[in-house]
Amino acid sequence: MVLPTLAIVGRPNVGKSTIFNRILGERVSIVEDTPGVTRDRIYGTSEWLGKEFAVIDTGGIDLGDEPFLAQIKDQAEIAIDEADVILFLADIESGVTDADERVAQILYRAKKPVVLAVNKVDNPERRQDIYDFYSLGFGEPYPLSGTHGIGLGDVLDAVLAAFPSEDKSVEDDSIKFSLIGRPNVGKSSLVNAILGENRVIVSPIEGTTRDAIDTKFEAVDETFTMIDTAGIRKRGKVYENTEKYAVMRALRAIDRSDVVLFVINAEEGIREQDKKVAGYAHEAGRGIIIVVNKWDTVEKDNHTMKDFENLIRQEFQYLDYAPIIFVSAKTKQRLQSLPAMIVAVSENQTRRIQSSVLNDVLMDAITVTPTPTVNGKRLRIYYMTQVAVKPPTFVVFVNDPDLLHFSYERFLINQLRQAFDFSGTPIHIIARKRK
């Protein structure tokens, strides 16, 4: 599902990050957060009046040593690229500035819905001053206090009203996948190589609400959708080298994918940013295939591939379920194997196991390794049932959920993996007290 997206834009020091955090804090229920990205997060999901949407804080995107106005321009253009609705933030203390007018000019040309809000209206007596902001050309400005959260409900009501209507008429049962990884691991080359190897149905497919482009193709008797290839192709090096922007694009692609191809550069090995992006794919419960690209550039002996695989398993211990493939976008080495791997992982993501079969495996596991005792109290597991797919999720009914230690939960997951093919997908176990 493609979430409608709100981007917050405005010159520095108008309170974009405060409003961003307020919006994320206003959600009715906690939607999937962004693991691994905390203090410097620029992307999240929220909910207002039952409507889920994504939020981007363009102010969090550091564009380096660019001049002041150039940074504002680039941040506004990022918002235009990414958003369905733009929240244009000014502040009552500074009034209408030249920088505000510059942002307004860029947004006006974009022809995207804009909601104008004036922040820092902490004193009700200042509300009359917001009428100066009509001059920016976006209709009625909404008074807002980020510090106290006053006025945010009215702003979010306006945002929801401006989101495009959902088109539910198109059924799409293709397998959706994306390529993620830090800058310069060869994602763009892999995209082109994969599409070059397979029959593209329509290229490009324009997104319904923004100019991101997905690409459909056929292989191994299946239809695939490669998510957001425009994000890799269009902006290219301009923003690819801005780490936060690259991570944000990866998070958004992951949210829309069934299976994620996590790309590592064989020449450069594993970096910290690799771990951040991979961690989110894992936490989001997506199917994962680890793709080691540029394998043609590595000097090899009989142990090279095994050594690299061992390094991956050591650095990404939580991805022990993810298959690894060594490829070259340049020489097309092993690329023909990728579609079948994606299909297999997608099938494993949706695999359902009958409760009777599950409980046979559970009883065998408990016989081999009895449940632990904590402070003199033994964990008792009565039965297990599967409650969800994508990822496969199982509930175990027990005497006391607090007694199910992480290590025994991991043992049960390993037993499930030995009994059934869950390669490429995380498995979630939830402990519940038997009533």
UniProtKB/Swiss-Prot annotation:
Disulfide cysteine pairs (residue numbers): none
Determine if Repeat is one of this entry's keywords. Answer: yes
Give the matching Pfam families: KH_dom-like, MMR_HSR1
Sorted alphabetically, the keyword list is: GTP-binding, Nucleotide-binding, Repeat, Ribosome biogenesis
- Which stretches make up the KH-like domain? 351-435
| Source domain of life | Bacteria
Per UniProt, GTP 1 binds at 10-17, 57-61, 119-122
The UniProt entry's sequence similarity note says:
Belongs to the TRAFAC class TrmE-Era-EngA-EngB-Septin-like GTPase superfamily. EngA (Der) GTPase family.
**Name of the protein described by the UniProt record:** GTPase Der
Organism for this UniProt entry = Lacticaseibacillus casei (strain BL23)
Q: What is the lineage of its organism?
A: Bacteria, Bacillati, Bacillota, Bacilli, Lactobacillales
